[in-house]
Amino acid sequence: MQEARDAIDVPVHGCVVMPGFVDPGMQLSLFDSKDALRPRRKRLQSFYEESVALMRGCLQHGTLTAGIRARPVNGFTGSDVALLRQMARIGNNPVNVVRAWRIGWQGGECPPLEAINNTLTTLRKHRLATMVELGAHNLRSDSALLCMLNNAQMEVSLNWRGSDHDQLARALQAASPACVFCDSNLSSAECQVLAKSRSTAIFTAHRDLLEDAPGGSLRDLADAGGALALTSGYDAESENNFNMQWVVALAVMRLRLSVEQAIVASTINAAYAMRCGSELGSLEVNKRAEILVLNLDDYRELPRRLGTNHVGMVIRDGNIVLNRSRWRVGAA
């Protein structure tokens, strides 16, 4: 009762109150790969400052949890560990960060298992990552790589670019991934396989718009009862969008989701895709108070009023960390 009496009363009349957005598929690299033949490695301090600025931008646009994947350049590189160290140095301020290592593939071949095992040992020892992303097309049920991941107690995510649905089913059975990064042009058979699995399918609405992809598989997967999530697909070298409000709008206008489905896909479903849904992604008792106050009368206006940052206030762990509204604490 004492805590309730001491709490600040924040007026939100005429606003939308919702959980913070969760973006599970942001990709970062230590290399400036504009020159594909001779990518240049960034200075660690420069990368750190750029990443902090990016996380602040996410906060200002309503993304309170970001899944960061270390993206290799020209296959497997030791720079991934250095990148994840810098992200661990940033920690969970200004936003929550779930770090993942994306294993690089060279010509469709897996990097040396010894190098992978050494990297996994380092990641686990220093708590630099909790997830590892694999290419589903390169996976076998008897893979020594899966044994390594199991021993390292790492969650698995798959990268699937569409092919034989039987191959997808085998990969899902072998790896039991938390999530699968997919294109939006999946076949109906692939949608059925994903719908029957316990994995969350993650789609990039922004990329589908640029590539003029049909995007009908999201609706098909949702109708089949599958779990789907949305990501901005941010990549510093190719896709610079990190605004999840924009992603929700595109999912409704281009990918045939309802507003409710798009919001669920960018909050609670995305949180479960990164195995943090028990703490984040919805406004429930015993969950962390990660809350957005949007300057909208109705949540259904979000896709209709495209191009405006509607975030008026951000609350993290019960504390106001961003206030763009007219209300001030002294006015309480």
Task: Pin down the residues of each PLM region.
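Divalent metal-coordination and catalytic microenvironments
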Residues: 14, 25, 62, 69, ...
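Metal-coordinating catalytic core of metallo-dependent amide/deamination hydrolases
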Residues: 38-52, 56, 66-169, 174
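Histidine/acidic-residue-rich catalytic or RNA/ligand-binding cores of hydrolases
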Residues: 77, 110, 140-144, 164-174, ...
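Glycine-enriched alpha-helix->loop->beta-strand junction motifs that scaffold or abut catalytic
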Residues: 128-129, 148-155, 172-179, 193-202, ...
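Catalytic beta/alpha-barrel core
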Residues: 131-138, 155-162, 177-188, 202-210
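His/Asp/Glu-enriched, well-ordered alpha-helical/loop segment
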Residues: 153, 218-296
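C-terminal cap of metal-dependent C-N hydrolases
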Residues: 268, 285-332
